[in-house]
Amino acid sequence: MLAFLILVTVTLASAHHSGEHFEGEKVFRVNVEDENDISLLHELASTRQIDFWKPDSVTQIKPHSTVDFRVKAEDILAVEDFLEQNELQYEVLINNLRSVLEAQFDSRVRTTGHSYEKYNNWETIEAWTKQVTSENPDLISRTAIGTTFLGNNIYLLKVGKPGPNKPAIFMDCGFHAREWISHAFCQWFVREAVLTYGYESHMTEFLNKLDFYVLPVLNIDGYIYTWTKNRMWRKTRSTNAGTTCIGTDPNRNFDAGWCTTGASTDPCDETYCGSAAESEKETKALADFIRNNLSSIKAYLTIHSYSQMILYPYSYDYKLPENNAELNNLAKAAVKELATLYGTKYTYGPGATTIYPAAGGSDDWAYDQGIKYSFTFELRDKGRYGFILPESQIQATCEETMLAIKYVTNYVLGHL
C-alpha cells in the first residue's frame, strides 16, 4: 500500500509555482446604494487594477447591491483612501489573500492520488476519468468531445445503465478556471452515482431511466493555469489577434444575445465575449455535442461559484422564459431541498434580475435550443472565502448540492 502512497509537501509556492503570490492583497466588499456609487466604482476601476469577483465586471454593478473585488497590495492604501473620501461603505472580506490561499488546502502534506474531498489538478482529474470508467464499465463510458486551445482532450463521462433511446441530462463544471468548487462537484456527482446505484432508490431509478452527460472540466487550459501560474485566472488561454491579452470568458461566448450586455469586446477584460460566438474551441465542442444530441437532452445544468443561487433564463434579456412559472417553482423547491441538510440559504430566479444581465451564457443558449429545464448553480459561499472555498467545505457543499440536483432530476424524469 505504501508503494502507492507518495506523499508530497504542498505549499502555495509548489501549487502555484513561478506565478502570482498574492501576498498582502485584499478582497473588499462595497455596499452600492445608487447610480452615484456605481459611477465612483467605475472611476476607481479606470485608475486602478481591480479584479471583480462579484459581479464579474464593473459594468454589471446594480444599485442596492454589494460588490466584491480584489486589490493588489501596492494599491491597497489608494483604494481605501478613495472609498473613505467618497464615503462608500465597505468591509474587508479577505485581509491577506495569500494566507487564505495557503489555508485552502486542509493539509500541506497531500497524496498524489485523486480524492473527492480535496481539490485535484487536471492531471489527477484526467487520470480519474479513465480509472472511474474502467472500474465501472456497466455504468460509465468516456469520450473526448474535442480539444482545448492548448490541445488538452475535453473528456465527457456518460453515466447510466446502457439502454436504447434514453433521455439525458447534461451537466458541466469548470467553465471559469478559478471556481474550483465547481470542478469538485462534477467529480462528487460521479462518485455518488457509482456508490449508490443499486442501493439508493432514486439514484438507481435515475441511472436506469436516464443518462447523465457529465463534463468534469470545460476550461481545462485555464484550470491548469490556476494551479501553475495564477490561482485567480478566470478565462480560457487562447490568444487574441492584435493584443497580448489572453483568453475569452467561455460563459460569454455562446450564441445567446452574444456580446450585447454584461460582456466586453475588450480582450483584456475578464468578461471578453470572444471574436465571435463559439470562437473558443471549448465552447464550440460543448455546443456541437449538445446540438448533435438535442433530441435526447431534457435538462442542462451548469455548475459555477460563488453566491449560493439557482438561476434560470434569461440572463441576456429581462424577458422571462415561456415556462417561467414552472422554472421558478422548480428552483424554489430545489433551494428548499438543498437547505434541509445544513441550512444553507440559496436565492433563485431569472439570471438578469437575480444576479446581473450577462449575454452569451450557456444556460440561455441551451434553453433557446429547446432544452426547457436549464439551470445555473452558483455554489458556496456568499463571499467570506469567495473563489477560495476551503477543502473542508467540499463535502458539505457537494452533499447539499446533490439534494438539489436529485430533486431537479426527479422532476424532469416525471415531466418527460
From Swiss-Prot:
Entry EC no(s): 3.4.17.2
Keyword annotations of the record: Carboxypeptidase, Cytoplasmic vesicle, Disulfide bond, Hydrolase, Metal-binding, Metalloprotease, Protease, Secreted, Signal, Zinc, Zymogen
Molecular function per GO: metallocarboxypeptidase activity; zinc ion binding
Disulfide bonds: C173-C186, C245-C268, C259-C273
Major location (coarse): secreted
Reactions that this protein is recorded to catalyse: Preferential release of a C-terminal lysine or arginine amino acid
Domain Peptidase M14: residue ranges: 118-412
Residue sites binding Zn(2+) per the record: H176, E179, H304
Pfam families: Peptidase_M14, Propep_M14
PROSITE patterns reported for this sequence: CARBOXYPEPT_ZN_1, CARBOXYPEPT_ZN_2, PEPTIDASE_M14
GO cellular component terms listed in the entry, alphabetical order: cytoplasmic vesicle; extracellular space
Signal peptide: 1-15
UniProt-listed GO biological process terms: proteolysis
Binding-site residues, substrate: H176, A177, R178, E179, R234, N251, R252, S305, Y306, Y356
Propeptide part(s) removed at maturation, as residue ranges: 16-110
Cofactor (UniProt): Zn(2+)
Co-factor remark: Binds 1 zinc ion per subunit.
Subcellular location: Secreted; Zymogen granule lumen
Active site (catalytic residues): E378
Assigned protein family: Belongs to the peptidase M14 family.
Name of the protein in question: Carboxypeptidase B
Naturally occurring in which organism (per UniProt): Sus scrofa (Pig)
